[in-house]
């Protein structure tokens, strides 16, 4: 009995040690911002009226990130909004600065781009000469009309060629709009054999593989629905950790919110008799009571599907 009690105590202490308290601030123009949601990818906190937040960060966390509020934008680095900081267990403080994004509180345009996936320098040349001019024309047109714009790249940013991440990222940065990334199956490193290791190159360039931000009246959630097993073997599912995180986030939203979940592989497989991935079913259950949209890539087709009452998928070529 004594040994059992010692074992239970050790387990309890181990569980307590799995989270480390951190502190930080959220400001805009040097002024505190209250009510901003902060997450380590496991749990959530919120900044107070002084812009201060405290969070028990999980030891397995990779990033501390903000849910950028509507009407605001994190500073850009290479076109990527810096709403995140890499988690360092030795660091106790994480400070964030946002900037106003006038006009985006109600009206904005989102450029959804899927599967550019260059594999060779020739592919990259074609991306630069054929695809980017059309995207640049769209963003230029938006600026002429005074519309705020952002872009989201829905995975397969490259085709098993992580050495091209920097070049592709630079091309999208040239659009002059914030660019949000989604990881695809071809964005995983073929030389790695665990999902965490295989996403390292992607994370270095684009940040977290799952996160959230607000634009207009829509709550955007980006998820990684590729469970990678190495050597090009993967499952199209959302892992349990992300499902728990997303479900906890759903509970923080006002009833009847408009939610858009961005991921690479479609939630519904029209070519498999409209089969819906099991983890997407669980996700839809978690967001019941909200207006839910999926925006996905992977198929190289443009399609719209009503999956169930109040749930629509927009699959982008």
Predicted regions and their residues:
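Sec-dependent N-terminal signal peptides
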Residues: 4-12
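Short, ordered, surface-exposed loop/turn motifs in non-cytosolic proteins
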Residues: 20-23, 27-42, 59
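Active-site glycine-centered loops adjacent to acidic/histidine catalytic or metal-binding residues
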Residues: 115, 155-156, 184-185, 264, ...
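Extended active-site neighborhood of metal-dependent phosphoesterases/phosphodiesterases
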Residues: 70-76, 83-86, 163-253, 276-295, ...
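N-terminal active-site segment of His-dependent metallophosphoesterases
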Residues: 21, 28-29, 72-166
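Short acidic, glycine-rich surface-loop motifs adjacent to enzyme active sites
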Residues: 250-271
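Short, acidic Ser/Thr/Gly-rich low-complexity loop/linker segments typical of extracellular
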Residues: 39-56
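Beta-strand-rich domain onsets/edges
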Residues: 11-21
